[in-house]
């Protein structure tokens, strides 16, 4: 039994979709969340900058005495060196491994689509893991750099004409290719899931990286003996790197409920 909190971070607020799922499967666990809202998005930046930001995010969470760290960010998960993750003093997981496995389990025609930030797609991390498990798979990857800004700025309401147009622009090629499974390779993308599903069609299975990762993290915490033993009453503390004004309203969108915890701005560059 371990009463320390779970640490979760993302480039912005998208990682709250993973927190939402984590609270569903582990309602008694305490959570510390950091959203780097002052430097979002990470996906358009170079590898060295992404790794630098990830190191700062991780150092901050370690100072909060967390017992387990979840990089609820496809860009970091695809870029942060695994050898560094292995040297951290607490277990670390990203979103790529569990999500890739879920896609392999779901596909019927062995045609898998991957959408994510430019950095995530460029890394080839999803494709490499999927091909290890399913060598004869056909993979169709597409960077969707506008999706994170659209979500962070509230353009995710069902039927928004601007968002629908951009979804069609990005995903038509994958639809034409006949993918039957599509990885939502960024934790912001579940906010667009309804519109993406409407465009791709009911026959295409959408793999939510935040949901899959939360389930995998819960299993890992249990296996490692790190759960706190509580069934209810988990608390949450939220930290951001930009002004926290209207955080509760924005967080409600990602969590499906009001945050119900404290939110504090920090100077992440000092970590």
PLM segments and residue spans:
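Non-catalytic structural scaffold of enzyme domains
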Residues: 1-271
């Amino acid at each position: 039994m371990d009463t320390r909190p779970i640490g979760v971070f993302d480039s912005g607020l998208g990682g709250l979709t993973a927190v939402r799922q984590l609270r569903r499967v582990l309602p008694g666990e305490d959570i510390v969340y950091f959203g780097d809202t002052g430097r979002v998005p990470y996906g358009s930046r170079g590898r060295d900058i992404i790794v630098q930001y990830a190191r700062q995010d991780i150092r901050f969470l370690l100072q909060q005495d967390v017992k387990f760290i979840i990089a609820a960010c496809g860009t970091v998960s695809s870029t942060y060196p695994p050898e560094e993750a292995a040297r951290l003093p607490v277990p670390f997981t990203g979103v790529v491994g569990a999500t890739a496995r879920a896609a392999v389990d779901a596909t019927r025609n062995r045609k898998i689509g991957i959408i994510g930030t430019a950095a995530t797609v460029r890394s080839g991390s999803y494709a490499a893991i999927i091909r290890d498990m399913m060598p004869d798979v056909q993979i169709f990857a597409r960077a969707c750099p506008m999706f994170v800004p659209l979500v962070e700025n509230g353009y995710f309401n069902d039927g928004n004409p601007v968002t629908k147009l951009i979804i069609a622009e990005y995903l038509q090629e994958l639809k034409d290719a006949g993918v039957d499974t599509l990885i939502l390779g960024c934790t912001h993308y579940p906010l667009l899931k309804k519109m993406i599903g409407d465009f791709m069609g009911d026959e295409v299975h959408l793999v939510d990286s935040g949901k899959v990762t939360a389930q995998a993290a819960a299993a890992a915490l249990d296996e490692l003996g790190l759960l706190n033993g509580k069934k209810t009453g988990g608390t949450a503390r939220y930290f951001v790197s930009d002004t926290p004004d209207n955080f509760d309203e924005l967080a409600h969108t990602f969590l499906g409920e009001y945050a119900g915890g404290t939110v504090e701005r920090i100077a992440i560059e000092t970590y």
